[in-house]
Amino acid sequence: MNAHSSLLPICKKATAHIAFSKAPSGISYVSRQEVGYPFHLGRTLKLPQDPPGMAAIYLQSCSGGLFAGETLHLQLHAGPHTQVHVSTGAATVAHSMLEQPARQTVTLIAETGALLEYLPMATILFPQARLHSVVNVTLHPNARVMLCDAFCLHVPPGSAGLPGFYRADLHIRCPAGTLLAGDRLALTGADLQRRLPGVSAELQALATFMLVGQDLPVDELKRALRDALRVVPESYLGVSALPNDCGVSVRIMTADAVALRSALHLAWACARQQLTGIAPRVRRK
């Protein structure tokens, strides 16, 4: 895993490509799946308090997390007028990385009229973890995308130290490739250890949540999200409009993973309520 042997296999690439279509009955379904190790795709679920016809799937890792030198690529393609919810069955562990960092790239394509929710659980950063997370969104007319990118820290018994770094790059583009909005985050373990007031203080779990789409009632969404998140204790919260009329962004920082998960559910439930009129219940995982 992290041995110093020169024979260690690194720079491994793994890909999962999942596409969704809408049946004549109105039900969304998985119409294509090419899923390689370490990804595992569960069966499609129909969950209570989801919009009618929505397909819900859970991705899992068969390898036990992210390791040094890995390059993972996940592509989700929501066809016209589909409704799709994608999450993970558990949090992903980014293990200590002594040789090389890991990279995870997620490509989200939402075609005309689609609703695509990509809401994985937070990544858990172990000491010396070094992870670069990239999310690329292609937004077609009248499409809506909900997404989050989140991490928290954990030191297993018998271990010590800080994460190396967490870097996140997010790009939202139109089908022609024009950049509509971008977000960039870079933090090191040393940054968090400083615990600067107004920057991170004692907080060690961070998430970015976005509702992406054009012609949304942005001011109404910002008010609703701020009201929904007021109840989150001991947190830093920020809600802002994305440029080029492409949605709303929420930054959340909390003391731990439990509070972060609760805050992300509140943000998701609020956004889903505003879009569909139906708020989702808390999912047991």
Swiss-Prot record:
<comment type="similarity">
    <text>Belongs to the UreD family.</text>
</comment>
<dbReference type="Pfam" id="PF01774">
    <property type="entry name" value="UreD"/>
</dbReference>
<comment type="subunit">
    <text>UreD, UreF and UreG form a complex that acts as a GTP-hydrolysis-dependent molecular chaperone, activating the urease apoprotein by helping to assemble the nickel containing metallocenter of UreC. The UreE protein probably delivers the nickel.</text>
</comment>
<keyword id="KW-0963">Cytoplasm</keyword>
<keyword id="KW-0143">Chaperone</keyword>
<comment type="function">
    <text>Required for maturation of urease via the functional incorporation of the urease nickel metallocenter.</text>
</comment>
<keyword id="KW-0996">Nickel insertion</keyword>
<protein>
    <recommendedName>
        <fullName>Urease accessory protein UreD 1</fullName>
    </recommendedName>
</protein>
<dbReference type="GO" id="GO:0016151">
    <property type="term" value="F:nickel cation binding"/>
</dbReference>
<dbReference type="InterPro" id="IPR002669">
    <property type="entry name" value="UreD"/>
</dbReference>
<dbReference type="GO" id="GO:0005737">
    <property type="term" value="C:cytoplasm"/>
</dbReference>
